[in-house]
A protein has these predicted regions:
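AMP-binding/adenylate-forming catalytic core of the ANL superfamily
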Residues: 63, 68-69, 91-182, 200, ...
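Sparse recognition of residues in long alpha-helices and their boundaries
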Residues: 93, 187, 191, 215-216
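Acidic/polar alpha-helix N-cap and adjacent early helical turns
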Residues: 210-219
Length: 219
């Protein structure tokens, strides 16, 4: 049998997208919508606006598998369901062939002086550095510009590499060569390990909580 990558969420159980059994399978894509499923990519700030083809936005879906609402939570239901369409909270894009790609979670998006920065994109680039074993990107408040954030990278180095200022400078130089200036991490913190779920997914929220506690905030 074949193993095909797909996509779905609890509110659209069990699945909304799948790579085709017969036909082209694209690396990094969750495939195309399954039959009777409608999908559109909408503006992150205004779900009534559809973004141009190839641009990132929030994934919105409609179909028989979309849930009817949250039990006894009418406000949450109203926030997530719009005329039968569900706002997924996932940032994605569609290519010219109708294949969809997941970019990141909306809640993890970083606002750098009005520019949208997606942590996963930066993490994928940093994983290409020979010294990096694991990495997580989050946004931290910019005290000079309320409502804006600065990019911070938590880095776990591979065995044999030293946690030095020289290594931080090397990583920043690597970022400057491979990222737009506003995406380059302003802060780099070395750690021996990153908080992860049982299946190995980095928990960015725990890192955000650590930063909040350092600022004296309650979490």
């Amino acid at each position: 049998g074949k193993v095909l990558e797909g996509y779905g969420m609890t509110e659209t159980s069990p699945v909304t997208h799948s790579n085709p059994i017969v036909g082209e399978r694209k690396i990094g894509s969750v495939g195309m919508p399954i039959p009777d499923t409608e999908v559109k990519i909408v503006d992150i700030e205004d779900y009534t606006k559809i973004v141009p083809l190839g641009e990132a936005g929030e994934i919105m879906m409609k179909g028989p598998q979309v849930f009817k609402g949250y039990w006894n939570k009418p406000e949450e239901t109203d926030n997530q369901l719009k005329d039968g369409w569900v706002l997924t909270g996932d940032i994605g894009k569609m290519d010219e062939d109708g294949y969809f790609y997941i970019v990141d979670r909306k809640k993890d998006m970083i606002d750098v002086s009005g520019f949208k920065v997606y942590p996963r994109e930066l993490e994928d680039i940093l994983f290409e550095h020979e010294a990096i074993e694991n990495v997580a990107i989050i946004g931290v408040p910019n005290p000079d510009l309320p409502g804006s954030e600065k990019v911070k990278a938590y880095v776990v180095l591979k065995d044999g590499y030293q946690e030095t200022d020289e290594m931080k400078n090397e990583i920043k130089a690597f970022c400057q060569q491979n990222m737009a200036p506003y995406k380059v991490p302003k802060f780099i913190e070395f750690r021996k390990e990153l908080p992860e779920t049982m299946v190995g997914k980095v928990q960015r929220k725990e890192l955000k909580d650590i930063e909040a506690k350092r600022r004296g905030e309650e979490v």
